[in-house]
């Protein structure tokens, strides 16, 4: 029901002339509650993202400029440190998150540099949410003027919730990238 209300807000914004798409350097950031997550499930989520983010970027046709700056792939230093140390506490997970990316100096600052990743755990430690920064609305076409799309937003939210649930239910997850010879097949079999 919350998604229905959010979709209606998007429709109202679109009709009022609001604009959002990658050409305007606008991304769609989805925050989901971190409730029920543990350091282990957050490590699972990290590994799930690391193994599928290239596939997601291709399937979603993400803007390369955004990937290079505002929604980077999982930091390899973080990934290696996380899977080596396997923290058992949230504070231990936070230490790995910030220290592995050399962003330990301003953990409580809103614009901490660690936040600019597709999967952002800075939001977890400052807001209690897990943020997915990888989405964007499609550029306007076919007579549409602004790119906002309620159905697209709904599918983004549902994907984030599914990834979160997958991480909670998995006994473990590998960071090894999935095959990408046939991206459409890989995406279908994964989801």
Which sequence ranges carry the predicted segments?
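Short, conserved phosphate-binding/catalytic loop or strand-edge motifs used
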Residues: 24-28
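Short glycine-rich or small-residue beta-strand-to-loop segments that form or flank ligand, phosphate
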Residues: 29-33
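C-terminal accessory/tail domains of diverse enzymes
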Residues: 1-22, 35-190
